[in-house]
Every structure is written in structure tokens, then in C-alpha cells.
Amino acid sequence: GQGLTNRLRAAASKEKGATVFGYYVDDPERFGIVEFDGDGKAISIEEKPRYPKSNYIIPGLYFYDNSVMEIARGLKPSARGELEITDVNIEYMKRGQLHVEKLDRDFVWLDAGTADNLLESAQVVRRVQDETGRYIACPEEIAYARGYISRQTLLRHAEELNKTLYGRYLECL
């Protein structure tokens, strides 16, 4: 979707609290969900609820301030014996420091949480790359476009990978 980079930068620049993202799905019971009040403020978060109160999930992209360390130290293992990221988000919500950025429907999020979903996600990425002739999330391409690396550095990376399709892609940028 358009504007993701700006949203990520805004989330990363916040000095206080946490920012997570909300994404609308048709099958929220498979995910951690977030419920909103009438003003769009998060009022509950549940992990894989049997009866979801919302269709908005939290797809696993989190930005936390430094207090996350103190929050994490205070966590207790769940029934599964694990520390849950959902509990971190709930603590920020209780403190009034959780911001949920809703992603519009033009954003694409792919669930890769099962083997079948991972395969399906890979096929979607392949199809988009084949149709557009551009790689998705190519770190060297992004770094070069943003001026973080020089053309010389880009070509050096391409040379190191010259026997691969990826290396040839980098050479053509």
C-alpha cells in the first residue's frame, strides 16, 4: 500500500509508547486481534479468540520505546509456557501508551504462519515479481534508491552474486 514507509518512519520516531498495526481480515479467530472503541482507540487485545470482538488483527510489526525492557521483565509465561508479545501490547494499552495504526485495504499482508500459508505467500511474491519484473523487499535496491549505498557498492554486491538471478537483477538496477 501507499505510504507504508512514512507510517514506519513515524512509528520509529515516537519516543514514548508503542505503535502496532491493525489489519482487517475475514478470519480473525486465527490471530491476535485488537478491538476499538467509537473513537478508534484500542480497548482490548486477545490472542486467537474463539469469538473475536473485531476483524482487526495485529500482524506482527511492532515499535516499542525503551520501557519494553521493563515490561518484558515483568511478564509471566502463558498457559503454553511462553512469554507472549500480546501481553506486552496489552501492558502498553493499559498504560494508555499503545497506538494502533490501521492499515487500509490497499495494503497486502500475507500470513506465513503455517507451511501452506508460507507456500502461498511465496507464490504471491513470485507472481508479483514475475509480473512487474521487480523484486519485493530487495535490501540492496532499497538502500541504493534511498542513497544509503553507492552504485559502486551495489555493483560489488551484484558481482558477488553474479551466478544467481538475484545478482543479475542487481546489475540491471
Language-model regions: role of each:
Residues 18, 24-27, 129, 141-142, ...:
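Preference for short coil/turn "hinge" residues that link or interrupt alpha-helices
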Residues 12-13, 41-141, 152-153:
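Catalytic-core segments of class I nucleotidyltransferases/pyrophosphorylases
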Residues 25, 56-57, 160:
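Generic detection of intrinsically disordered/low-complexity segments and helix-coil linkers/edges
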Residues 1-38, 64-66, 72-75:
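Conserved beta-loop-beta/alpha segment of the NTase-like Rossmann-fold superfamily
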Residues 5-6, 114, 170:
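N-terminal glycine-rich phosphate-binding loop and ensuing alpha1 helix
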Residues 148-173:
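Short, amphipathic C-terminal "tail helix"
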Residues 145:
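Short, amphipathic alpha-helical "recognition" segments used to contact nucleic acids or chromatin
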